[in-house]
Amino acid sequence: MEHEQKSGAVLLRLLRLLWLLPHSWAVLEASTPVLWDDPQNHTFRHTLFCQDGIPNIGLSETYDEDELFSFDFSQNTRVPRLPDFAEWAQGQGDASAIAFGKSFCEMLMREVSPKLEGQIPVSRGLSVAEVFTLKPLEFGKPNTLVCFISNLFPPTLTVNWQLHSAPVEGASPTSISAVDGLTFQAFSYLNFTPEPFDLYSCTVTHEIDRYTAIAYWVPQNALPSDLLENALCGVAFALGVLGTIIGIVFFLCSQRPCSGD
């Protein structure tokens, strides 16, 4: 009897929160900034998630699958992905709505998830990793490696970088954002200076089932260095001068009278 009363109290609290949830969404929609005046159809996605993993709470805001903001719950502030978005990150006035969403999500996970465990199938995504450079590759010039992780669900993972199988430190915190289809994607960035024989790897480990995806990067199609460009220009100039001299010689020879009888 006591157990039934406790379950009823939990469900009653859940119904009350479900009734309040649309009101919190209305506050959020009213404070959503208009970034571009474009008559085409676009999608602004505000996704808050919580889970038994790292990170245990997260919020991402995307525009047509491109992340604009994440949320730092320890500082209670938005974090722009690019400096150009900083002015929109401040003063949105929806901190109370975000706090409500966080509490609601944590309550669902705490009160409802244990009752559904073993009764509904568990979804898993096999992560796919890809590594590429942020700027065109030039040996000896600073650049950034990007590890892009797709098909991520649930969004709990660790990312490790290696150079010639040795761990590399200094990577940026992993950025997670929601995409269409109730899945997530993530980005990890590593600043580096490329050399001709580099071999970098990005290892992505899914915390739930310990599934690991590895992506490798080796230099390909590098732009010519300044020294090589100067050498090629010098060779081209020398060939041009040599061709001019040969042309003049042939012209002079053609003007000489033929020796006859």
Swiss-Prot record:
Region (Alpha-2): 125-217
Spans within the Cytoplasmic topological domain: 253-261
Glycosylation sites noted in the Swiss-Prot or TrEMBL record: N41
Residues covered by the Ig-like C1-type domain: 114-215
Claim: Endoplasmic reticulum is one of the keywords in the record: no
Disulfide bond residue pairs: C50-C105, C147-C202
All ranges on the Lumenal side of the membrane: 27-231
Family: Belongs to the MHC class II family.
Subunit comment: Heterodimer of an alpha chain (DMA) and a beta chain (DMB). Interacts with MHCII; this interaction mediates rapid selection of high-affinity peptides.
Its job: Plays a critical role in catalyzing the release of class II-associated invariant chain peptide (CLIP) from newly synthesized MHC class II molecules and freeing the peptide binding site for acquisition of antigenic peptides.
Protein name (Swiss-Prot/TrEMBL): Class II histocompatibility antigen, M alpha chain
Organism per entry: Mus musculus
